[in-house]
Amino acid sequence: MTTVTTAPEAEYWLQTGWMEEPGAELGIHKPITIDRKTNLHEHRAYWCVRRAQDIFFSLLALIALSPLMLLTCIAVWIDSPGASPVFSQLRVGRNGKLFRLYKFRSMCPNAESKLNDLLQDNEMDGPVFKMKDDPRITRVGHFIHKTSIDELPQLVNILKGDMSIVGPRPALPREVAQYTPYEWQRLYVTPGLSCYWQIAPHRNQLSFEEWMALDVKYVKERSFLVDWKIIFATFRAVLFGHGE
């Protein structure tokens, strides 16, 4: 079944060439625009310097934010007694490599088993599940999710090399299993904490295909300048609540 986006941002993507004319087929029929081997060779120096930056800043952040992370662990433990404050989930990294992503628990312990009952209320098209008022989110979970505190354990993923500070968000295996060849291009880079989609105005109004187009756009455009622009825009979005 062909899906055509109707989001307000569609006109922008048409103008920038990241979407075909209305009525054209999207997804599997979008062209593969990135050669993975050439892309890697051309960015070798970039990868090395970026990895050094990731190690330095993740270590610095872990030290500076350790009191906040400890308080969060205590708050989550009090809110959900018996459940681990930090949980890990299998995600897909660069070139399809699987890794364990760490997060502070923002949902009830049996959240995965309740997912099937909520699929009918999914507010996102494509293979991704998103629900604004997800009943599985706990009281503390609402706060740490809104402020992105729940993502802080991923600094460990960055230090390990599973993730980077900037890059497309790591997807679940069940989501990647439904990717088209075009969407698979977002896996050519190391996943990160933030990317173009996270800083897009009204990001939750974007369709799945627009989200994927933003990630592929980053893979093509990435540079030190682009990365730092995304970092500063992410801080602004977290502090002032932009992007919802």
Identify the meaning behind each predicted range.
Residues 1-63, 184, 218-220, 242-244:
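N-terminal hydrophobic signal-anchor/signal peptide
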Residues 2, 177, 181-191, 195-230, ...:
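Cytosol-/stroma-facing membrane-proximal "stalk/adaptor" domains immediately downstream
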Residues 41-111, 230-244:
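A hydrophobic, helix-centered structural microdomain
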